[in-house]
Curated annotation (Swiss-Prot):
Protein name according to UniProt: Putative ankyrin repeat protein L112
Gene source species: Acanthamoeba polyphaga mimivirus
ANK repeats: 62-91, 104-132, 133-162, 193-219, 220-249, 251-279, 281-309, 310-339, 341-368, 400-429, 431-457
Signal peptide: none
Pfam family, one: Ank_2
Length: 457
């Protein structure tokens, strides 16, 4: 039995909408009769958006307006229906504008091109959306690989300007060979754009596109090799070497790029071409370490590459990145006291607790420059765990006339404020000063906590 809007009392419809949660928007869009259910929505609809983090899928509840939703989905009949109601000043639209929302024609065109909704693309262009005020609709269609949409935009008389040429570069970044072929046949693309497109194709590993562009007589630069090396595209690397690209340029920067990307197979391949370890750029070791590639750092040492010249930098940036295994390895190789101290600053700045503890155990001076790390870094960032570690190690928590507690009040670091008081900082003589510092920096949580301290006692 079919159910219409008038078959059920309002209270039941409200319960149904609540029960359907993220699917409620689809109920409203079943037909024009059910569309009246938006009267019962107090807040915007929402849908669950899927986001992938590595191998794990996550869903985030995201508020949506009805018009954005139907445009994104390409529901042309509903779009036309809503626009007709709007043109007639229908109360259903006027009274529910918060739920319905609004969208410009140009934005709607962009959504349509992004999702390859050709029918809505045609509709919004006919309604006056501009295909020439921005290259975004065309560029988006190129990135997504929607050839039919790209063809239609050109059929509408799109202006050929520099931003249009850039679309072939964007298509190369996403491996859209069909788009690259169409654009190169449709318009005359300047050589600079073809050259950049070739570099992007190599960088992102699209060998088929690289080969196609090479046949268009593009210029081959070493930048294409660097991009392929850093991203681990061994087939592209082999292809470029076959074309005559010299891997020895800039002190074998191709190997340095592979070190940064963590691609041992590419390093070994390049060395097999006759490159000597001593020819490798001194930055190779540093780049391997700063990106946490311990295996490559060890490999460079084993083959006799320079691991000394940039060792201090390597330690500092591996500490900054929190790569404890790399930090341990570099310290085993031998570093100066100055290097240990600078690495501790970086690790503290980026709250790498395990690295900080290891560096301190290895001899880094955690009290350097009158407890600078504690008073000027930790106390400005509310690193509570690290603050307690430093306090337990013996930093002066009232250094420079109570600078730490003043700093946390200035920066709103309430966790460390509580910690300092717990470990015995006498706040009473300077309580008014601390409150004034917090007030001048709009730190309401600090103000409330300080004012409530006597009550808590």
């Amino acid at each position: 039995m079919d159910i219409t809007y008038d078959d059920l009392p309002v209270e039941i419809w409200i319960r149904i909408l609540k029960f359907m949660k993220d699917s409620a928007v689809n109920l409203v869009l079943v037909n024009t009769d059910f569309f009246k259910l938006i009267y019962f929505k107090k807040n915007k609809f929402y849908e669950l958006k899927e986001f992938n983090f590595g191998m794990q899928k996550n869903y985030v509840k995201q508020r949506i307006t009805l018009i954005n939703y139907v445009v994104e989905k390409g529901y042309l009949d509903i779009i036309v229906y809503i626009n007709n109601l709007k043109s007639n000043h229908n109360p259903l639209i006027i009274d529910n504008i918060k739920i319905l929302g609004s969208i410009s024609k140009d934005t709607a065109l962009w959504y349509s091109c992004k999702n390859n909704n050709l029918a809505t693309t045609k509709y919004f262009i006919n309604k006056g959306a501009s295909i020439n005020s921005s290259s975004l609709p065309l560029k988006t269609a190129c990135i997504e690989g929607h050839l039919d949409t790209v063809k239609y935009l050109f059929s509408c008389g799109i202006e050929i300007i520099n931003s249009i040429y850039d679309c072939i570069v964007s298509a190369c970044c996403y491996g859209r060979l069909n788009i690259v072929i169409y654009l190169s046949n449709k318009i005359s693309i300047p050589g600079d754009y073809i050259n950049e497109a070739f570099v992007m194709a190599c960088k992102y590993g699209y060998l088929d596109i690289a080969k196609y562009l090479f046949n268009l007589d593009c210029s081959i630069t070493v930048d294409a090799l660097y991009g392929a090396c850093i991203n681990g595209h061994i087939e592209v690397v082999e292809y470029l070497i076959g074309l005559g690209v010299d891997p020895r340029k800039e002190k074998c920067w191709a190997i340095t790029s592979a070190c940064q990307g963590g691609h041992l197979n590419i390093i070994e391949f390049l060395l097999s071409l006759g490159i000597k370890p001593k020819e490798i750029n001194v930055d190779a070791f540093y780049h391997a370490c700063k990106t946490g590639n311990l295996e490559i750092a060890k490999y460079l040492k084993e083959i006799g590459a320079d691991t000394i010249t940039r060792r201090d930098w390597a330690l500092e940036l591996s500490a900054r990145g929190g790569y404890l295994d790399v930090v341990k390895y570099i310290i085993e190789l031998g570093v100066s006291q100055k290097s240990l101290n600078k690495a501790l600053i970086d690790a503290t700045l980026f709250c790498r607790v395990e690295v900080v503890e290891y560096l301190v155990d290895s001899g880094s001076d955690f009290r350097q420059n009158d407890d600078y790390l504690f008073r000027s870094i930790i106390c400005t960032r509310d690193y509570v765990e690290m603050a307690e570690y430093f306090i337990m190690k013996g930093v002066n928590i009232i250094v420079n006339n109570n600078e730490p507690i003043k700093t946390v009040c200035h920066n709103g670091c309430i966790g460390i404020l509580k910690l300092l008081i717990m470990y015995g900082v006498d706040y009473n003589p300077i309580k008014d000063q601390l409150i004034n510092i917090a007030k001048s920096n709009n730190q309401s949580a600090i103000i409330k906590y300080l004012e409530d301290l006597d009550t808590l006692k």
